[in-house]
């Protein structure tokens, strides 16, 4: 049978009752722990400092009189400040690491009633992390007034038991609410995007380091940056504002002035001093979209502001300070800009700690339907006009939106515009098939203008030498290739009829040879698509 071993602090307040016989009239948690009829403590290891040695000896004698089978062991520790979390945790952590546990022979309990609140928290953390393979035990005084000298009650808390899963499930529910918040409540289905949001959630809560968001225009970089700030504000991590600027709009002296501010007379026309966006973001978040467009001087000053949280306003010889978190957005490959000498390598290294690439809408076809529902609801909240799709109209729009013809070059911004147009033309709050067909034609027209550029990007001037008949067919083939996961999958879709009558098929080889007629390869089509 395993022995029961308990650890605890000598309670300098609760365990102290003087030295006379009157001490037996006071409830003392450590003594009463050893008086429980249903629990026999075989060994009690009491932690105390040198000043509490006398109190420990008194407890040891009293325990021997009420529970002679209990061995009481002195564990002398040195604590300068029992309310200092770092010191107490380090002390108990060292104790746990140095103790020779024998869980196959002994059952361990941690008495958390004595000791400071800091000590109780540290006991809990060490038990939860399994540095101490023990259950928690809490003692309480007797409830009945007619039994003032009774041993009271004890409660054992096993952090491994399923009854405490409810606590863990609360954290899980809260975390899911956080993920939904970052996604604006949209039930996204794309696994890559969902994994990325889970990572962003952890970074947003635990880190204040710069975050770099890559992705095409309209993929939601600015929106996500704002949600990250709101999440931090909800957790009381930030109290400042969200400050946003597109760096592509900053040129010349106005770039310095806009970002870092200026003093009066810094340049022609500077009649008043200006605070600048970095100072406006103090205590909050600064979102620099298209950060790759910043000039060399601005990059150097931004690096100093990130690292030292100080900078010089334009035209000033006095430093100012601003403590903000930076989120940068870009559609360009900053690594390539660094290689070309157009972007500072040290700045890139500083903002590249947390990098996330937001996929475009075309890469998240599973999320088109839930985002459609979100945009419909958003339109209703903005305008007060509730609209709904007819079943046939909804089916037709989704079929086109997820087809190879739908390039969604404007991504979610374009999807939002599409919903706005259909909602505007809705009759009596219903989006009909006629409205959807008009919208599909409008989108087709918009996207047709961009199609030749895909061929031109692949073939250059040679694209002009291809007949219109072949060019239109090739464009459609390329669109399907870009939607397919593999060469074989694209071949099966393209040769879906002719392959039925053949005993053996090699769709991948047929497609490879077709592309080769125009000097193209599967790899070239995919590479150009991923970089576009």
Swiss-Prot record:
Q: Name one Pfam family in it.
A: Sigma54_activat
Task: Supply one GO molecular-function term.
Answer: DNA-binding transcription factor activity
Does Protease count among this protein's keywords? no
What GO cellular component term, any one, is given?
Answer: protein-DNA complex
User: Which residues mediate DNA binding here?
Assistant: 485-504
Q: Which Gene3D superfamilies match?
A: 1.10.8.60, P-loop containing nucleotide triphosphate hydrolases
Q: Which InterPro entries match?
A: AAA+_ATPase, P-loop_NTPase, RtcR, Sigma54_dep_tscrpt_act_RtcR, Sigma_54_int, Sigma_54_int_dom_ATP-bd_2
Q: Where is the Sigma-54 factor interaction domain?
A: 186-424
Residues binding ATP: 215-222, 281-290
Q: What keywords tag this UniProt record? A: ATP-binding, DNA-binding, Nucleotide-binding, Repressor, Transcription, Transcription regulation, Two-component regulatory system
Q: Which GO terms describe its biological process?
A: phosphorelay signal transduction system; positive regulation of DNA-templated transcription
What exactly does this protein do? Transcriptional repressor of the rtcAB genes. Interacts with sigma-54.
User: What PANTHER family does UniProt report for this protein, alphabetically?
Assistant: TRANSCRIPTIONAL REGULATORY PROTEIN (PTHR32071), TRANSCRIPTIONAL REGULATORY PROTEIN RTCR (PTHR32071:SF14)
Task: Note the NCBIfam families from the entry.
Answer: RNA_repair_RtcR
Q: What protein name applies here?
A: Transcriptional regulatory protein RtcR
Which species expresses this protein natively?
Answer: Escherichia coli (strain K12)
The record's gene field reads rtcR
């Amino acid at each position: 049978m395993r022995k029961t071993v308990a650890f605890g602090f000598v309670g300098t307040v609760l365990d102290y009752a003087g030295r006379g016989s009157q001490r037996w009239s006071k409830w003392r948690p450590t003594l009463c722990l050893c008086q429980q009829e249903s629990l026999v403590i075989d060994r009690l290891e009491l932690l105390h400092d040198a000043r509490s040695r006398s109190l420990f000896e008194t407890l040891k004698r009293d325990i021997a009189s009420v529970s002679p089978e209990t061995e009481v062991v002195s564990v002398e520790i040195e604590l300068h400040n029992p309310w200092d979390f770092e010191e107490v945790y380090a002390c108990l952590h060292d104790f746990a690491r140095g103790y020779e546990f024998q869980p196959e022979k002994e059952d361990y309990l941690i008495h958390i009633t004595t000791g400071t609140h800091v000590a109780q928290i540290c006991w809990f953390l060490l038990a939860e992390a399994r540095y101490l393979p023990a259950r928690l035990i809490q003692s309480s005084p007797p409830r009945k007034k007619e039994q003032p000298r009774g041993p009271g009650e004890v409660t054992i808390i096993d952090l491994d038991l399923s009854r405490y899963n409810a606590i863990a499930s609360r954290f899980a529910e809260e975390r899911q609410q956080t993920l939904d918040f970052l996604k604006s409540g949209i039930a996204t289905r794309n696994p890559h995007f969902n994994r990325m949001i889970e990572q962003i959630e952890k970074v947003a809560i635990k880190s204040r380091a710069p975050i770099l968001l890559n992705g095409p225009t309209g993929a939601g970089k600015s929106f996500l940056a704002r949600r990250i700030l709101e999440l931090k504000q909800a957790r009381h991590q930030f109290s400042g504002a969200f400050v946003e600027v597109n760096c592509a709009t900053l040129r010349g002296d106005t770039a310095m002035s806009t970002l870092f501010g200026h003093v009066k007379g810094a340049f022609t026309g500077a009649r008043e001093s200006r605070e600048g966006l970095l100072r406006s973001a103090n205590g909050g978040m600064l979102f620099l979209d298209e950060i790759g467009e910043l000039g060399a001087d601005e990059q150097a000053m931004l690096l100093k502001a990130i690292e030292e949280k100080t900078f010089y306003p334009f035209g000033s010889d006095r430093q100012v300070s601003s403590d903000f978190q930076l989120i940068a957005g870009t559609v360009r490959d900053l690594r390539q800009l660094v290689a070309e000498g157009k972007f500072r390598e040290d700045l890139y290294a500083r903002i590249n700690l947390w990098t996330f690439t937001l996929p475009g809408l075309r890469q998240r076809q599973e999320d088109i339907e839930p985002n459609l529902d979100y945009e419909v609801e958003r339109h209703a909240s903005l305008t007060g006009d509730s609209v709904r799709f007819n079943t046939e109209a909804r089916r037709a729009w989704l079929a086109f939106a997820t087809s190879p013809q739908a390039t969604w070059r404007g991504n979610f911004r374009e999807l939002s515009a599409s919903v706005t147009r259909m909602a505007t033309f809705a009759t009596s709050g219903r989006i009909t098939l006629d409205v959807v067909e008009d919208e599909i034609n409008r989108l087709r027209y918009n996207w047709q203008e961009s199609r030749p550029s895909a061929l031109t990007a692949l073939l250059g001037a040679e694209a002009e030498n291809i007949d219109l008949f072949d060019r239109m067919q090739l464009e459609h083939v390329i669109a399907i290739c870009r939607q397919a996961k593999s060469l074989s999958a694209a071949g099966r879709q393209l040769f879906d009829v002719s392959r039925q009558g053949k005993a053996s098929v090699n769709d991948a080889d047929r497609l490879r040879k077709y592309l080769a007629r125009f000097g193209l390869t599967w790899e070239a089509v995919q590479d150009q698509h991923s970089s576009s």
